[in-house]
């Protein structure tokens, strides 16, 4: 089985001020890969990997994926942060599958992020159920 398209929905923390609601991400970066002190690579670049950024379109938002919950300002210049979109987008590129990504802005990636996330998950799911009817 190979799907023709993968649609990812999840929550994200806003880095860009004023970002709210459900947004579509079209550019994906690995925000916590950092070997700059060891190799001549940029933040987000993985050694021996030729895919370091994924750009599906110039429209949409920049998403930085990582393994940690963000509760303070980060160094990478992205609009929002999550924990899975980069990996999903990369698998889709490698397998030749169309990828779309929608994120509900659940928090502002600050010190209140974890409590805001819990409160906003249900609201985001309800809004995405409405949005998916437009596909």
Task: Go through the PLM ranges and name each one.
Residues 1-135:
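Glycine-rich phosphate- or other oxyanion-binding loops that anchor nucleotides, phosphorylated ligands
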């Amino acid at each position: 089985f190979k799907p023709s398209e993968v649609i990812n929905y999840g929550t994200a923390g806003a880095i860009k001020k004023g970002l709210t609601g459900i947004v579509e991400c079209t550019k994906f970066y690995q925000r916590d890969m950092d070997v700059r002190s060891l190799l001549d690579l940029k933040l987000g670049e993985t050694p021996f990997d030729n895919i370091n950024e994924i750009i599906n379109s110039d429209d949409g938002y920049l998403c930085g994926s990582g393994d940690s919950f963000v509760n303070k300002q980060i160094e990478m210049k992205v609009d929002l942060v999550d924990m899975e979109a980069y990996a999903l987008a990369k698998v889709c590129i490698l397998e030749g599958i169309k990828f779309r990504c929608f994120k509900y802005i659940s928090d502002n990636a600050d010190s209140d992020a974890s409590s805001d996330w819990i409160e906003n998950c249900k609201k985001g799911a309800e809004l995405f159920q409405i949005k998916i009817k437009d596909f």
